[in-house]
Amino acid sequence: MTAPLPRGTGAAPRARDGFARLVHAEWTKLRTVRRWLLTLVGAVLVTVLVSLFSALGSSSETARGGGPPGPTGADGRPVLDGFSFAYRTLTGDGTVTARVSVPEGDGRGTPDWAKAGLLVKESTRPGADYAALMVTARHGVRLQSAFTRDVAGSAVPPGGLRWLRLTRDGARVTGYESADGRAWHEVGTVDLDGPDSKGPAPHAVPAGFFVTSPDIQSREREFGSASVDQRPTVSTARFDRVRLDGRARPERWRHVGVGGDPRRDAGELRPSGSGFTLSGSGDIAPTTPPNDLAVMALDGVQLGLVLVAAVGVLFVTAEYRRGMIRTTLALSPRRGRVLLAKAVVIGAVSFAAGLVATFTAYLVSADPLRGDDDPPLFGDISLADGPMLRALVGSAAVLALIAVLALGLGALLRGTAAAIAVVVVVFVLPLILLGTLPLDLAHLLQRFTPVAGFAVQGTLPRHDQVATVCLPEEGCYPQGPWTGLLTLAGYAAVVLGAALWRLRRRDA
């Protein structure tokens, strides 16, 4: 009878110890080949120097026109706050109700985010906090506040009508919607004394109905040629059964164009049967800085990856070229574990080198990029912010995944030149072409090729309620940062898996 194995012994621990020895052996190989270490150091230097020179050579212009700065929200960030507003001053609690039509544009088109609805605002000063319940041209009923908060209600078809109601109770404003004016459903509640407000909500506030219509943006590219079109629009909506319950003054509705932009239509309020027709132009929305500090500060990563990939390829092809792979495999009959050990070592070392490269590149590039612009060109993002840390650490992870992918290619092709050429075609060539291809094709490359990993560098906030054009040359990727990084990780896993399959079934 076989005696039971003592606790803590057995095949599994020995296997783990064996793999640890393989990892140590591969690490010893890497650190004793001076050319490989020097190449990794070169990758760090290239990343840092290219990023620095790019920052020193970059120039950005801000359009000030000698006028006053634009409005800012309660958090001090620039916002858009221009719309056509018909209001009365509500002194205390109260309710405003109306049946609102979906806004329609003039002959220049209707933006998807054209808005018509009810509004309670701390004042008519641009940037003041507000609660707005609206019908949009393509996105149904929405309750918005603080320029970034957006709560979806029901869908409303083009040409449709919806009853809307805003009820003020102290600093709390609650939005309701109804299809028939009898059965009401709550959309959400806004606290005008919340953490995003500049102070206590005033006792007397403007309350009424509004219309706004954002610019229509379009950019077309056809293999090097580009056209940019951004034009203001005017939208109109009808408001029936308008009613303001509560103590209010004056007796008549007062019309004002909030924002006062002379380049825009101030809008017009016209009585129409039992209600009003109101037209307007502008937007109530957050603004996004025109440039992404992380993307520009990490410009050198796109060249540094070539050297990192070269080390990944050489880490396996050098043994094939010199015949050492037979000795390596003879010491470990389970061939797959050898390649996995190499992947662990090259991935970890490349990640460490990437951290040094990305953090140093940011530290030397951020100040030249920021310059002395006022307002700041890149918003107020700093190294301590989560998105910036994600961009820096994520870029190091991109370099590590590229090294692992290159290792897999080297094991598959068993030729240094061929494997490095594939890396250049897969990564460098698409990054060069993204700025010249038609947008739809460029976005496909960004989504479904390994360059998707660079989406992790994006730090600009995205707001679903703001229509924007995503341009690859500005570092914009159509997918989220983690989705892009997972796409690259998937490619690395597939290539490494294919290399493992081939290594197990063919002679070295």
Locate predicted features:
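Secretory targeting signals
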Residues: 2-16, 41-76, 80-82, 143-147, ...
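Extracellular glycan-recognition regions
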Residues: 15-292, 313-316
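Helix-capping/transition residues at the boundaries of transmembrane alpha-helices
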Residues: 29, 317, 328-330, 406, ...
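Residues that define the loop-to-transmembrane-helix transition and helix capping
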Residues: 37, 336, 417-418
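Hydrophobic/aromatic positions within or immediately flanking transmembrane alpha-helices
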Residues: 40, 326, 339, 420-421
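Central hydrophobic cores of alpha-helical transmembrane segments
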Residues: 41-42, 419-430, 446-451
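Transmembrane helix boundary and interhelical loop/hinge segments in multi-pass membrane proteins
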Residues: 312-336, 343
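Short cytosolic juxtamembrane segments of multi-pass membrane proteins
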Residues: 503-508
